[in-house]
Structures are given as structure tokens and as C-alpha cells.
Amino acid sequence: MAGTTLPTPLYGLYRQELGFGELMVTVVFAVYAVGVIVALLVAGDFSDKLGRRPVLFAALALSAASAGCFLLEGGLPLLFSGRLLSGFAAGLFSGAATAVVLELAPSGSGGFAATAANMGGLGCGPLLAGLLAQYAPRPLILPFAAHLVLLAVAFALTLALPETVRPPRPRPALRPRGMEVPREVRPVFVPAGLACFTGFAVFGLFTAVSPGFVSGTLHIGNLAVSGAIVFSVFCASLVGQSLTGRFGAPVALPLGCLGLVVGMAQVGLSLLLSSLVVLVTGAVTGGIGQGLAFRSALTAVSARAPEEHRGGTISALFVVAYLGISLPVVGVGALSTGLGLRNAGLVFSGCVVVLASAVGAQLWRTRKAEAAALATAG
């Protein structure tokens, strides 16, 4: 997963070298989400039919091809190709790798181990790229060469993994899994989906355009700082997800929305004050809110969905989440062409605050109404 966020601190260098603006940066980033969504819809259950290891090997091969596109430095076409391949790989990894971790981890620790591997990888990508780009030669080459080395290690480890699935015989046809949200799930799915959309929009902001904020608004040209800020968002999300069990999904979901509201208000304030400290504080607060909202939304939707429709319902939730990580940041890029990146960031922060506030308030009212109904029935 580190490869999917590896280019984050490097977008400014690509912008200088290829001569495109912030809008194109966000479009290049958003292509990744298209790849993830396509992979989830087309191949989300392939590891159940083919086995975990074949799908993991395919994802590793796609990741290597993505790194190769960036290494060739062939301009925008290869940047788009690299991001699309990276999205395909992430879509395959999200299902097969998560399942393997859940199946092989010690009892009771699988959920946290899967979350830690996912968020840890996403966070380490920009941190590694930022450090190498800032303090080592060939900033647009070395990060992806290092990624290929890590992929070789991952390939060797995957060879050593036991297969945890016995593919059915005869092998069933490989068809797109599609999406389906049953009628009885929709009252839970709609607010949960909006919370996921909002939380992943925060991820999109930090992974696509926060390096532009750091260099253009805060006037900090150190790429390692940009990478560390994105790293902090994903680490904070991991903390938020680990806290969800303590509160329970009905409380954690509106609490996550509150974290998103406070975090994005801090991000907006950091742009007004040109303050790195306030930006980092907003990144951590928003990351915790995202983690709480996402994990509790996934728990609530999974618990409500009938078993025969659970896979399609969860796929639909992930599609909503990845639309959130892509569409809003393209809007930020478009706004930045006329308003400038600082003002576009302020508009984005305000929109997230309004949406998260509305969703959180509705969730809290629903929870209180359900509690009152239970008390009356008792």
C-alpha cells in the first residue's frame, strides 16, 4: 500500500518539471481512485475463487508496473498510467491482503493487524518518498527504485505464505461482483456513507494538495516535512480506528464526525495564519475523526446487511469512500486556478465542516431517538 501514496510529496517536483498546475495534480491523483473502484467492482471477490496468493502476486506485479511508469519519467501519460495501475493494485490488496492478515493473525488481533498494515503502509509511502527526495540524489527516481526493492521482499514473503483458501472445483466463473444495498440497510448506509465520503475527502486533501499548501502557503520547501504531515494523518486514523471498539459504533460515528469538524476547522485556521503547528494539529485531529468514522461506519453497515448481500454492500461503501477521496480534491484543484490554493483550501475546509456537522447531528439525533424508544419499550 505504500506505493499508492509514494508520489504525494513529489507532485511539486512533477509540476515544476512538466509545467502543469494544481488542477492537473489533483486529476493525476484522482485517477488512482478510479483504479481502486474498478478493481473492487470487477475483482473484489477473486481471491475467494482463485486463492489469496494468486491475487496477491497479481497486485504485486501491478505495483511493480506502476513503479516502472514513474521510473521512466515519460511525462503525463506515464504519470496517469502509473497512478491507474497503482489503483488497480490497491483494489486487489484491500481485499486479498486484508483477508490473509485476518486469517493468519493470532485470534483476536486480526482486525487491528489488518488496519495497521493498511494505514501503516499508506502513511509510510509519503514519509519514505519525502525523506529520499529531500536528502538523497535523484528525487524522482530513488523513491520508486526503493519501492521495487520493497516489492521484491514482499514477493518473497508471499511465496512463503500458506494458502488460506481452497479454491472451489470446478472453478466458478470470474464475474464482476457489483454492488447492492438492500432496502433495509439504507437507513444506516446513507449516513455511514456520507461520513465515509467526508473522511476520505480529508485523506484526499492531504495526499493530493497538502504539499502545495506546505510549499506555497507556509513557504516550507522541505519535502520530508510534507511527507511527515501526510504520515501523521494516516497514523492518527489508525489511532481513531483502534478507539472505535471502546465507544461502540453508535457513539463512535458521530464522534468521528466531530473530529472531522474540529480537524478541518484547524486546517482552515492554519491556512489563514500560515501556521505549520496548527496544520499538523488539524491533520492529527482530522485523522482520528476519519478513523473513528470509517471503522464505525464499516461496522454498522456490515452488522445491518444480510449475509447474502454483505459483500456487495461493503463494496458500495468503499466505492462511496473512494469517490470521496477523488472528486472533492479535483474540485479544490479547479477552484485553485481562479481563487488560489489557500482560498480553495478554505472553501474545501468549510464544506467539510458543514457536511460533517450535518451528518454528525443527524446521527446523534437518531441515536437519542433509538435510546428513547428502547427506554419506553423497557
Language-model features: where?
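C-terminal transmembrane helical hairpin of 12-TM major facilitator-type secondary transporters
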Residues: 252-295
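Helix-loop-helix hairpin linking two adjacent transmembrane segments in secondary transporters
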Residues: 107, 112-159
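Cytoplasmic helix-loop-helix junction between adjacent transmembrane helices
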Residues: 82-118
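Conserved MFS/SLC helix-loop-helix module at the cytosolic interface between two early adjacent transmembrane helices
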Residues: 37-76
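Helix-breaking motifs and short loop linkers at transmembrane-helix boundaries and internal kinks
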Residues: 19, 51, 72-77, 137, ...
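Symmetry-related core transmembrane helices of the 12-TM Major Facilitator Superfamily/SLC fold
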Residues: 142-158, 345-362
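A late C-terminal transmembrane helix in Major Facilitator Superfamily
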Residues: 296-349
